[in-house]
C-alpha cells in the first residue's frame, strides 16, 4: 500500500481526538466528538473512544472480509461498549462519540463507509474526484447555529451560544430527523453511507476529518480537484498547513464563522497503483 498520513491537533500541546490507521487493504479514519464542559459519564475521554473504536474496526474489517463494513462497525461499537460500560455511565447524553470513514479493497471493488461529517475523496481515473460526505450533521447544524455564527469566535458570548447549540445538537444525535454518529449504540452503524466502487476506476482514495476539509467546505478557498492536487504534490502535511494558514488569518471567525478557531486535522491519502 502506498499511503501517506498526516494528523495535527487543534492546538500544539492539545490532545488529538482524530485517529487514522491502515492495514493491508483497509484504512480507517475517526474524528472523536463530544460536548465541551459537559458531564460525559465516561472516565476515558474522547481520544480514547475514537482510537479504541478505530483500532477495533481496523482489525475486524481486516480479519472478517465476509462481513460488511457496517457490520464490522456495529461489532466494534459493541466491543468498545463492553470495555467500559462496567465503569462508565453510557446513558449520559454527552457520552463520547466519533465520526467514521472506512474503506476496504477487495479483489475487484473498493467498499466504503462514511458516518458523520468526515469525508471520503474518491479520485476516478477519468472523471476526477468525488467527495462522499454525510451531510446530516451539517443540515441539522444549519438550523440551530445562527446565533453562534453571528458572534466572534472565542468571545464569552460565542462560548455561551456555542454551549447552547451543542446541547441542542446532542438532543438530536442518533435520532430520526437528526444525525447519526458512532457512540454507545451499535445500531448507528445501520445509518452509515455505504457503497462500492470498481478498483480499476480509482487512482487514489483519501480519508479526511472535517478539520482537514475546511479549505473546501468552510472557507471556500479550494475545490476538491485542487485539494487532490495539493495532496499529490505536498501530501497531507501541506494540506493541513494551508488550513492552519487560513485559520490564522481569521482567528475570531468574522470571515468564516465556526465553532472552533482551529480543529484537529487528519488526512490519509492512499495511492492506488495501476
Spans of features found by a protein language model:
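PP2C/PPM-type serine/threonine phosphatase catalytic domain
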Residues: 1-274
